[in-house]
Amino acid sequence: MSDGLNSRLLRGSSRRKVYCKQPKCQNHLWLWLFFFNLKTNYMTEYIPGLAGVPATKSSISSIDGEKGILAYRGYSIQDLVEHSSFEETALLLMNGELPSPQELTNFKNTLNKRNEVKRKIRHLLWSLPSTGHSMDVLQTAIASMATFYPDAGASEPDSSYTQNALIKIISNMSTLVAMWTRISRGYDPIPPSKTMTYAENFMYMCFGEESDPEIVNLLDASLILHAEHTINASTFSTMVTASSLANPFASIAAGVGTLAGPLHGNANENVLIMLDEIGSPKNARKWIEDRLKNKQVIWGMGHREYKTKDPRATILEKMIKTYIKKNGLKLSNRFETALEVESICNELLSQKGVYPNVDFYSGILYSEIFNFTKEHFTSIFAMARSAGWVAHWHEQVSDNRIFRPTQIYIGADFRDYPAQ
């Protein structure tokens, strides 16, 4: 096989498709080469974005896109949201099994013990422009943590030193995100508590007061829903970096940078911008029809893995409705507009398998109920996803082979340097 081929092997064909760019291959012709493998037959073809291409074996999470099921280590997210906590879910993702009560208590204590950010990193955050995006700040801070843990590496992923570094990442994520919500607005950070839960502590560090337990429970559920989602772009980025045997801080920093993109974690910010642009439910149909006519994105709609509604979106929508009804609140204009957008998109796009994804309702939850500004949405997403990234880092380096895909070369043929 040519080293310049980005390909997928498909069972059931006796033909291999090879793109030749050597000078002797005039007009860059496709060559059909027939071959026989003793065990099976394969065909290779270029797959843009590696869509649907198996890149690894993993036991961390799974998706049934037809039925709309997401499970962590075999447990459905519905069950985890109803019965678990973010701390327990993080430990499940990391270790593969639900912890015992004592193991969970020990883990919570360790998270709280390690939730303070190093003084020099605190100074680093203060030195950055307050206008900086939270994801750029978070990526910088996570990468800098490696300088304090030089021996946390892939060569001994199960050592107590490396395991403590992994826990430090999860623990510091919430502190770093909360610090920037305040520093970016000119306020002093609030030191983390040593007794609160992960979700409770985050709200306290952001707002300086203990939050309503109902709000804390909603945040905890949201963190569970965002903790893991198989091989998405940011997780794959983390894995690719880990496959070079990079330290966990460099690998998770790569994931943070990838999550910042508008086609990934940043999408929930764009959903809120979209809803504000639509303005009210009565404007939704024309706005959507115009977008479809011009082949433009409708933010928060559609997911490559799901042929039905994203189960996380279903849970988030239900959570918001339950909270509003229980507290006798009026539907916000944004939420009413979102419901109308979903209704119209179901009418126009459901036959194409396009339904709301997790980003469609998460921004509303963050802004309308938690009172976070949209600039911090994606960093809160990263805070939750750190549990999944850490689990994938460990899984990757424990049975590693460096990722080295191939490509299809479409540049100039071999040529001589011009004579002087």
Residue spans of the language-model regions?
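Generic detector of N-terminal low-structure segments
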Residues: 7, 11, 29, 36-38
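Hydrophobic alpha-helical bundle cores within soluble ligand-binding/oligomerization subdomains
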Residues: 42-420
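N-terminal amphipathic/hydrophobic targeting modules at extreme N-termini
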Residues: 22-33
